[in-house]
């Protein structure tokens, strides 16, 4: 055993003294003379090699051998290698330059492989750098490269950039369309359905059809947005392309009719389904129950539930979650708790929606003392999503010590804490009366260069504003602008609210004007917040300017804001004359019960 250990050490010493050419030059030729490359042997060589340029060059060398293509293991391993190289050489250009010096011939394949490594590793900034670097070497990206870059743009939410790449693909293949469809369906908005229609039409026009999985996504999007007529067209396409209509497709169509506010058509379709011999399953019944509950047709929902029980169908966790939610909405909190406690007997594992529903039930019933008891059964055996949910619920109901305890358990379990986790943590600290600790932790998180979004910055700033720490909040916001951290319209609106509350109305007005120069446009809430502050200070000229802007942009103000503007400007003859038609329309909307409380007080950024 001792001899073996010594030999391993000696072998490593010998290998380390060999030149690059002996390992990656002569060795491959001798090796291939004996037998061809295999995935297992290449992966073994890569895994045993250091993360340096020689290993990367060897990876490229293998890729250009006849009839050899790297498998997923090799690509996944190379993610760590290129990450180390980018830290060492800082840029892709320098890595390419060093590869040339080491004798690697720079061809389009090198860029394509590098792009795929960064793409697989979700290192999107470097993937973009590789893609743009192709042109400097005179290489034109092929369809595969453009497909990957389109996917990157979608994942970075640069939809216009993704579509521009899609349009620029000269020879689109199945994956070009599939990537675009997948992302549009995942985004899930009604506007994304337009994108799906455009891509699907082009796809069929070029002789391609979606697979079963993608058809399911498209159908789900149509039904989720209540576009049932489009959903039936998708079903027609599925049948034409040879894909059978399953019971799950029927269930989605039933759900779609409910979402479009047509319960009778949903029931008719359900009956039609039975007539043609397609037996409904638990998913179908759950769609019916949820549809009735959402429309307030509770009696009908419980009739369907009784049918489920009479047919002996065992409820799954989705149906149990729905029943907990339904009982909570009806104020039948004891029955909601009974469903929750029955899960163990049914051998069902609670998920994030289960805990969200039961915690909501306990909070609404005022049984706050039961919250720790319900969650005690979870112990420390929960995943990142459930941990985020628990800490958020605890934070919202004022149990900040419990929230921080859950977060400490998550940290101890070495979870890959995400932006949402950090947001909940900082908000819990602020609500728990520890704003200084929150600010200190905020700076530490930023220093570690985590992937943080605009919501993270907005939440800490808003939490400080709610504590009355206006100047501190504004200072953090200005630092975000200076450091070019991601900010959105909510971030600016929160900062404007802080300035309004701090009576720094001139700065609030300037910030409202400046945000448009940065490409971020105010929304209804932004206008409501700034107008409320301006009306309090009787800044008539600025209110006039903002009102003109709202009219020009077609922004519909809420009744309270309209009342404040009308009360301020209608007393001036010139203003009344300029906005007469607008004011006349507003007057018909006013009631005696219009609440003229501070509009900016209603703005709060939830971490949920």
UniProtKB/Swiss-Prot annotation:
Gene3D superfamilies: Tetratricopeptide repeat domain
Keywords noted in UniProt: Repeat
Pfam families documented for this protein: PPR, PPR_2
Lineage: superkingdom: Eukaryota
Lineage: Eukaryota, Viridiplantae, Streptophyta, Embryophyta, Tracheophyta
Name of the molecule in the record: Putative pentatricopeptide repeat-containing protein At1g16830
PPR repeats: from-to residues: 107-141, 142-172, 173-210, 211-245, 246-280, 281-315, 316-350, 351-381, 383-417, 418-452, 453-487, 488-522, 523-557
Entry-linked NCBIfam families: PPR
Organism expressing this protein natively: Arabidopsis thaliana (Mouse-ear cress)
Family to which this protein belongs: Belongs to the PPR family. P subfamily.
InterPro entries: Pentatricopeptide_rpt, PPR_P_subfamily, TPR-like_helical_dom_sf
Presence of keyword Iron: no
UniProt keyword Zinc-finger present: no
